[in-house]
Design a protein with these regions (language model features):
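Amphipathic alpha-helical repeat scaffolds of TPR domains
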Residues: 1, 14-33, 54-73, 95-109, ...
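Active-site-surrounding "flap" and adjacent substrate/cofactor-binding loops of secreted or lumenal enzymes
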Residues: 1-11
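Asp-box/WD-like beta-propeller blade repeats and closely related beta-sheet repeat scaffolds
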Residues: 27, 34-51
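TPR-repeat structural position
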Residues: 39, 81, 114-115, 149, ...
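Amphipathic alpha-helical segments of tetratricopeptide repeats
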Residues: 47-51, 86-89, 93, 122-127, ...
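Extended catalytic-interface subdomain
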Residues: 151, 156-159, 175-209
Length: 216
């Protein structure tokens, strides 16, 4: 779909220099060649765009995300995560209500040795996007690393409940519920010694699984 969309842009299109920079970067990402090389080239392109247009916070977010994407399965992952997190925090300082900045900072610092760097973003993110069940859940990644079990529990509970509201509003199958948050909630209850609540969570998921199978 991306390749088709790019091919539909005429070379004579009257676009700004910045818009053309974005298009060229995207062409690199979805162009020919091995994926890891394209990912690296795209990341460098987004770095140039962000440096060229420092007020373009979205460019910074895409640059941060590109580094996070490259940090998987590489010996250089820690450096890339720290760099991605630093960029996300820079954007977060410029705009404390930027959802992507908070989101990517949490992902970047989702390690025991880095988690404190993401604590401010974790405490802020849920209030930035209250209708997003993923935004409600994500702070738990930092809270869990720091052993903040009550806070992690609340994040996952809110993620689960918000997803229920979303499924009901959109009138979609129950498979759309955020079972990732529910599973994390189960784990948090176990860590807190709240075994009855953990059992209740398990029964909820089992019930939904059975209903989902029967509806097919």
């Amino acid at each position: 779909a991306a390749i088709k969309a790019l091919s539909n842009i005429p070379r004579s299109a009257k676009l700004t220099h910045r818009e053309w920079d974005y298009i060229k970067a995207t062409q690199v990402l979805y162009g020919k060649g091995e994926k890891h090389l394209r990912d690296r080239a795209y990341s460098l392109a987004m770095q140039k765009i962000y440096h060229k247009y420092p007020k373009d916070l979205e460019a910074g977010c895409f640059y941060s995300l590109s580094l996070l994407g490259m940090s998987r399965n590489t010996e250089d992952s820690l450096r890339l995560q720290i760099e991605a997190g630093a960029i996300a925090l820079e954007i977060f300082q410029k705009n404390p209500n930027h959802p992507c900045a908070a989101h990517y900072a949490i992902h970047a610092f989702d390690k025991p040795e880095l988690a404190r760097l993401g604590l401010t973003s974790a405490k802020r993110y849920a209030s930035i996007a209250p209708a997003s069940h993923h935004a409600q859940h994500m702070p738990a990644h930092i809270f869990l690393q720091l052993g903040m079990w009550p806070e992690a529990t609340n994040s996952n509970k809110n993620g689960w409940l918000t997803s229920i509201k979303w499924v009901e509003k959109k009138k979609i199958p129950i498979s759309g519920k955020d079972y990732h948050s529910l599973q994390w909630l189960h784990y948090c209850y176990l860590q807190l010694g709240l075994f009855k609540k953990a059992e209740s969570v398990f029964k909820t998921q089992l019930k939904d699984m059975q209903e989902g199978i029967q509806s097919k």
